[in-house]
């Protein structure tokens, strides 16, 4: 459970804590924008990433609730769902025993360039989007299909 707690601390509780730290200021000024980083994995459970997927789903739901609570005060809440982006995320991902994975996933290596991800995110935020899925066709199709049939997309994402 130690590994699961570490993942939840980084991917969920850290974003909640940061938001709670700035929220009083935003409420006082009656304006602002809070942007959360979730993941396509938070919309589609992925094999060997159960806790990561759960943490990213949790921040998505927390953001949805926050949006309902603060919208009338002029605060906008957005959630970004990156697909595969070329970063060290899989290299540093924690394995079941709490150690760094130590190698880069092929999907990450072939993912969207980090600069392109940033540009697409900023563009979507400037258009006042609240639910922002950024990735290739594969990720966007997966998100769409997961809404129609979560169990089928879950089985399709399994690796032997």
Question: Could you describe each region identified by the protein language model?
Answer:
Residues 19, 55:
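Active-site helix of classical SDR
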């Amino acid at each position: 459970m130690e590994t699961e707690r570490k993942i939840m601390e980084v991917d969920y509780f850290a974003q909640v804590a940061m938001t709670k730290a700035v929220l009083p200021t935003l409420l006082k000024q009656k304006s602002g924008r809070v942007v959360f980083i979730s993941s396509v994995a938070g919309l589609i459970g992925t094999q060997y990433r159960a806790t990561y997927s759960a943490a990213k789903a949790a921040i998505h739901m927390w953001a949805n609730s926050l949006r309902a609570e603060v919208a009338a005060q002029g605060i906008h809440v957005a959630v970004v769902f990156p697909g595969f982006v070329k970063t060290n995320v899989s290299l540093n991902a924690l394995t079941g025993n709490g150690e760094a994975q130590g190698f880069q996933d092929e999907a990450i290596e072939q993912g969207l360039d980090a600069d392109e991800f940033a540009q697409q995110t900023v563009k979507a935020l400037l258009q006042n989007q609240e639910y922002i899925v950024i990735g290739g066709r594969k990720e966007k199709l997966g998100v769409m299909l997961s809404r129609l049939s979560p169990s089928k997309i879950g089985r399709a994402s399994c690796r032997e």
